[in-house]
Design a protein with these regions (language model features):
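A short, exposed loop/beta-hairpin motif centered on an aromatic-Gly-Thr core
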Residues: 22-36
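Generic structural motif
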Residues: 14-16, 33-34, 77-79, 100
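Generic hydrophobic secondary-structure signal
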Residues: 9-11, 30, 106
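Short, mixed-charge low-complexity intrinsically disordered segments
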Residues: 47-127
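Short, well-structured hydrophobic secondary-structure segments
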Residues: 32-39, 46-50
Length: 127
């Protein structure tokens, strides 16, 4: 194992009602190599919740898809005062351990060059 390897735990959550899509919600850098990343991923599977969910108010089933990937299903039951019955909502997210294989940062943005147009010249700008 190279000492400069970078390990991450990635959390992808589904969103949308009709055409569900996946979005990268968390990108957690882990120091300590692959085994530390696996431990952190298992912790995230047991504790992480999407926005609007409370861990203490939902059921959770963790599925190990592979040695480095999990699918977590959350289920919550509520009984609003205005209804005569309870309802159930569900959500799921993926947790994956990943090693960075090609890091390339985006180049920094620069302000656009000011252009001397006809109006700018009329007011003395762009000389």
């Amino acid at each position: 194992m190279a000492s400069d390897e970078q390990w991450y735990v990635l959390v992808e959550a589904s969103y949308g009602f009709t055409d569900t899509q996946w979005k990268l919600e968390e990108k957690c850098h882990v120091v300590g190599g692959r085994s530390a990343a696996l431990s952190r991923a298992e912790e995230i599977c047991r504790t992480w919740c999407p926005f609007g969910w409370k861990p203490e108010e939902c059921g959770r089933t963790v599925f190990e898809v592979s040695e480095t990937s999990w699918l977590v299903e959350l289920i919550e039951e509520r009984w609003p005062e205005s209804d005569d019955h309870a309802y159930t909502r569900g959500e799921h997210f993926r947790v994956t351990v990943a090693r960075v294989v090609h890091p390339k940062e985006a180049p920094p943005a620069h302000p656009p060059e000011k252009k001397a147009g006809a109006i700018r010249r009329a007011f003395g700008g762009g000389r």
